[in-house]
């Protein structure tokens, strides 16, 4: 790490790359905005593609401001064992359109159907994972307490267990896949516009073999007439996370702020920019003072924060980071990558992260 004027510490790594390439209720019934056709939901039926037009289409706008990140002891309202399942792991993100006739009261039934579906697909020759037994145990669990509004549906956590082929009879099955669907502070106008037989859990996070992820998605699409898509995180989203997490430093030491850029040079140039957390916060505080009574953060504040760091970097290295693509942001609170991978490092700020990702998922869905 270099001590550079003006009172701003950073570490820089430049890499030149050559040739790289339960008994839970779903949200209360909402006003029906139009009549919907009834579609089957058997796990063996082809999807009806009703997901393309689930009720009146609401134009979702990208917010230009949002509330500052606030710490909350999430374990006061969410089972600590459930929270432990969400933190520390790396999750791959997808969006999913509203689920037709999904019911939180039917989770045990869904677990049985998904387990049978995976076994049937494997027996038909679908590659699952080398070394796994033919039997799979699937569990669906409602994670109560993450929902922030009456319109938010409760989070659903899915876990798949299996035994290795040569495991002893007494050996316990091992967890081979995890995933969860969530909605935190979803756009209320959009959620209210959905017909009453739809549930929106737009953010899908997975950890495990891609083959199992694909099977789980396939089952959901057949069972609930929904559709999945990849969820990449653009530079604007990463900028927001950098600013929101930096603003948390006085209350919770973020330990570091690491930013990774890719620059379109020949050969390509990767830049890892590590900023002292106190210096990053002082820059942020000069733009959005801590004593400000308005806890709303404007996009202009975020842009000024990132511009300040880019300007400081250029002053010393004569490299325009703004010409490249921001790929990753990480602090002790969590990390997020451009390709749609996240890690939750601190549960006290999980609501801020999930609210932003829920927004990204809703904006990415087809209209």
From Swiss-Prot:
Keywords: Centromere, Chromosome, Nucleus. InterPro entries: CENP-L. It is found in: Nucleus; Chromosome, Centromere. Its main location: nucleus. GO terms for cellular component: chromosome, centromeric region; nucleus. It holds the Pfam family CENP-L. The keyword Transferase does not apply. The keyword Phosphoprotein does not apply. Belongs to the CENP-L/IML3 family. Probable component of a centromeric complex involved in assembly of kinetochore proteins, mitotic progression and chromosome segregation. This is Centromere protein L.
